[in-house]
Amino acid sequence: DAATTGSSCYISDIVDVPTVQNVLMVSDASRFIIAFGCNDYGSATQDPMLIRWSGQEDPYDWTPDATNQAGSIRLSHGSAIIGVQQTRQEIVVFTDSSVYSMQYLGAPQVWGTQLLGDNISIVGQNAIATAANVVYWMGVDKFYAYDGTVQTLNCDLRRHVFNDFN
């Protein structure tokens, strides 16, 4: 195949690759391509809560089978994946109403998710940043931080941003 021979390949030639998604990323440590809010296998319809990943170190293999680690998982809290932030230990996934931790587990499950908090918002895909291993984001009415637990940040900036802007 193209991955092992170095030959070219068109995206249309790859079987089961997600054709629509909200976010696409490459995991740092485990080397998977991950599509968030994407279409399911054999479907062109986007599922805004579905996460799919390619085989490890193989961007051409998206069909799960016994010889690879390609797979998928669907989140249950929220109606759409809005954004993601990669950290050293995990990928933090934001839906319109919750926050998840996504961690590489290895075969056979490959990736697992854990709900970190519900009834938590984010204003958009680019409202996330990481500094000193802490993930910060702006919700629709609060600022948040995650360093192992989700916390609401109380600060003067909050009042200015959420009360004074048009």
Predicted regions and their residues:
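Short, solvent-exposed secondary-structure boundary motifs
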Residues: 13-16, 73-74, 127
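Helix-rich catalytic cores of soluble enzyme domains
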Residues: 24-66, 71, 77-92
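Beta-sheet-dominated scaffold domains
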Residues: 40, 76-166
